[in-house]
Amino acid sequence: MKDSRKKGSRKKGKKGSLEAKGLKESRSEESRLAQGSLGGVRPETGDSAETEIRTENAPGCRAELLPEDFREKMRKLLGKEYEAYLESFEKPCHNGLRVNTMKLSEEDWNRLSPFQTEPVPWIENGFYYNASDEGSGRPSRHPYYYAGLYYLQEPSAMTPANLLPVKPGDRVLDICAAPGGKSTELGARLRGEGLLFSNDISNSRAKALLKNLEMAGIPNICVSSEAPEKLSEFLPEFFDCILVDAPCSGEGMFRREPDMIKSYRERGPEDYVPIQRAIMEEAVKMLRPGGYLLYSTCTFDREENEGTIRYILDRHPDMSLCSLPHRFGFAEGIGMPECVRLFPHRIEGEGHFAALLRRAGSGERPRRKDRTAQSGASLKLPDEALAFLSCLNLRRGGTEGLPGQVEEKNGKLYCLPPDFQDMKGAGKGIRFLRTGLLLGELKRGRFEPSQALAMALRKEEYPFTADFQAEDERVIRYLKGETVALREEEASWPDGSWVLVCTDGFPLGWAKKAGLNLKNKYYPGWRWQ
């Protein structure tokens, strides 16, 4: 039988079908959406290096390709701004990078940057870059990317993490975190204090999330792959700040990634609304009194945005909206002026929505007093591991030594954030990919430091370093996994020493000295391709 629908319109699902099946079915649907099997869209699209590379020079979507029902909805939503919105499809999309302030300041970046960049007005550490400028190469193919100095991210996608009022020492949950653009910013703002708990229900996406957090040098992490209701079972009222960057229909990304329109025709807003509301319900359970919850999407749909917020406010009288700044072309929420909407005809970025909620209560949880850091001398470890850890010269946040409890599990050493000890039975009930900073691995009495540790260190915190300028061809050789030759004056360390390889003062990974060579120990899964 022929499909009688108009060309360009979206296939309608059974409205409310997911809602009727309850949270359990919503979780199953969310899992499939997160893994892309239903063409599901995550707000962080354009947030990983791979996506950014793919879309750097993409032609974008033409307005005439938009589904008819979507165009009609936007005409009603925007009124006299509708034509300006359509005209934005004729303009180029914008590429962005966000400086990792865990490793350097915006001022340091401005002095160091090899790229032509312009600041993103609403993000202090956000910059636009021109993908067609081949003079300094692509940011995704520069040693500084491998050093974790910045994260490639669509400019509007930088907004949610920036709006959540995180401060050092907080316990922060990013509940739909992969691939990690927002988590890496949240971690940088914690400054290594408190706890960053990053979760994604898709195990494969959670692995990419872990890599990006390690590359950014965030030490105080827990990374899990769990359903939200499982997290809330073990972590009630545990977090100071929560980010819900929810799966959505992706209407705000049509201009940048036309392929999303096909997914939209199969699965639209009515399929995502019950999923979003189920996630938010679990998030509220994990928020402490006085804590903040930031909800964001990359869609324009009212039910997915203001409708979901209204749903939560009606069911939770102790939750209230906080006003977000309406600067730089940000629009107010529809019927909720406290929220913000980002439109591509108003800003140099794609479509986004954000709302900040606060839970009533005094909210100040007691801070742990037993935050003394461990030094290598106090640990019961094999001699080689003890000797290596004793070499570390860590002095951060008023402490000296490792910033947490060191534990051994299956031959691997981890430095656990102090707040991890307050999770009670969560360690046995939640599927963790990582708890704390992986220090290294014990192999038949030998100790091999981890790639994650290298990225979390500063050059001055380890005594044996080989520091090459970014233009030195040996940097690329190292990133490709090759042996690196040293000049006589560069090889002053004892043979067999673990050497921290750096570029312009920023760590890349480990090598072992063998004569006038550095035997490559760069993690194979991260190598330059």
Where in the sequence are the language-model features?
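Conserved class I S-adenosyl-L-methionine
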Residues: 169-176
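Conserved SAM-binding loop of SAM-dependent methyltransferases across substrates and taxa
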Residues: 179-192
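S-adenosyl-L-methionine
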Residues: 201-235
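Class I S-adenosyl-L-methionine
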Residues: 239, 292-295, 300-415, 422
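Helix-to-beta-strand junctions that scaffold the AdoMet/dcAdoMet cofactor pocket
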Residues: 191, 287-289
